[in-house]
């Protein structure tokens, strides 16, 4: 997608899955990786530990040529697509691998235009042909605070991340088996990925989407100093993320290379969800305790009465000793984004799941 005439924006993403052990971070990510491996797409996949020089050398050897049919002609492109995956982010970003150097390299490659050149002690000058890096990683909530201590790194590196959080399992089954429908879905996904991999060209806005984009874009704040550094890094790229997610939504919908208003709505919605997750990452342990107290109060309501609808004023009375109105609104927004509740006017609708 051409952006303001200065550079092309590609829908590569850096995604960080954060949650406690057992919620399915690595398992769900691995399923997607394995499905991608079963396609014929020319995507280089590197998993877990690697040093910056080794990553540079791996990418320099991983350039691929791909043929596309475009406008009745055959177009041959040369680029370096890479999926870097870490089932535990601590295995990838460690003192042994050079956490600062690797985060700085990934930061630079996030929106790289054209070729990338660097120098290593072993091979000297290295050139990577049009790198396009997608990064998936999983970690515990405590890892960010304990290991990624540099605020400058957190602002630059995490500012390029879409953060997805989970606090509990959504499904429980004593015996998980693939059903015939699951097997068929897997085949359909592989087939769709093959079609997506053959797409070539530039995405365009539909008239309605372009109008929506302009309105939303000009509504975004210009001053990033009011937020902490972690969220300011994300906020400065909020528009980029909305575009990238809208493109990916459009790809999942069809092959016309047109971004519709619905595609953009989905992209903006996901940006808001991830931004709220990043804000929660900066919360103190005391703030997390308050969130859990509100969640527990809502759960208690539902266990005592059959109705899952709760009046906002009644909840405010119960929590007024340790949460003012503004703080409660922030907490309810977080719980709504997690899917635990739905707020309609002054009514809170509990959706669960409920923890014992």
Outline where the language-model segments fall.
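Phosphate-handling catalytic cores of nucleic-acid transaction enzymes
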Residues: 1-356
């Amino acid at each position: 997608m051409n952006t303001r005439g200065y550079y092309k924006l590609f829908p590569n993403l850096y995604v960080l899955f954060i949650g406690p052990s057992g919620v399915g971070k690595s398992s769900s990510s691995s399923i997607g990786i394995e499905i991608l491996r079963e396609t014929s797409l020319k995507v280089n996949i590197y998993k877990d530990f690697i040093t910056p020089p080794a990553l540079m050398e791996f990418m320099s050897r991983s350039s691929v040529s791909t043929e596309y049919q475009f406008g009745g002609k055959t177009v041959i492109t040369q680029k370096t697509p890479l999926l870097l995956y870490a089932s535990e982010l601590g295995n990838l970003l460690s003192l042994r691998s050079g956490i600062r150097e690797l985060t700085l390299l990934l930061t630079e490659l996030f929106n790289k235009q054209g070729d990338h050149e660097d120098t290593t002690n072993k091979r000297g000058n290295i050139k990577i042909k049009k790198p396009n890096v997608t990064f998936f990683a999983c970690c515990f909530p405590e890892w960010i605070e304990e290991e990624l201590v540099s605020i400058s790194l957190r602002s630059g590196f995490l500012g390029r991340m879409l953060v997805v959080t989970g606090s509990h399992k959504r499904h429980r089954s004593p015996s998980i088996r693939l059903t015939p429908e699951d097997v068929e879905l897997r085949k359909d996904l592989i087939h769709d990925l093959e079609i997506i991999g053959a797409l070539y060209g530039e995405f365009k806005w539909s008239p309605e989407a372009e109008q929506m984009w302009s309105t939303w874009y000009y509504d975004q704040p210009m001053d990033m100093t009011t937020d902490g550094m972690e969220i300011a890094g994300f906020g400065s790229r909020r528009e980029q993320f909305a575009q990238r997610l809208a493109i990916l939504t459009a790809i999942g919908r069809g092959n016309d290379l047109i971004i519709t208003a619905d595609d953009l709505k989905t992209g903006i919605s996901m940006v808001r969800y991830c931004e709220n997750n990043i804000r929660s990452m900066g919360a103190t342990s005391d703030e997390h305790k308050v969130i859990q107290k509100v969640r527990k109060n809502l759960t208690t309501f539902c266990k005592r009465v059959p109705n899952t609808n709760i009046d906002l004023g009644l909840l405010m009375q119960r929590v007024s000793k340790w949460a003012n109105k503004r703080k409660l609104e922030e907490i309810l927004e977080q719980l709504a984004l997690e899917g635990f509740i739905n707020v309609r006017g002054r009514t809170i609708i509990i959706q669960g799941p409920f923890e014992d």
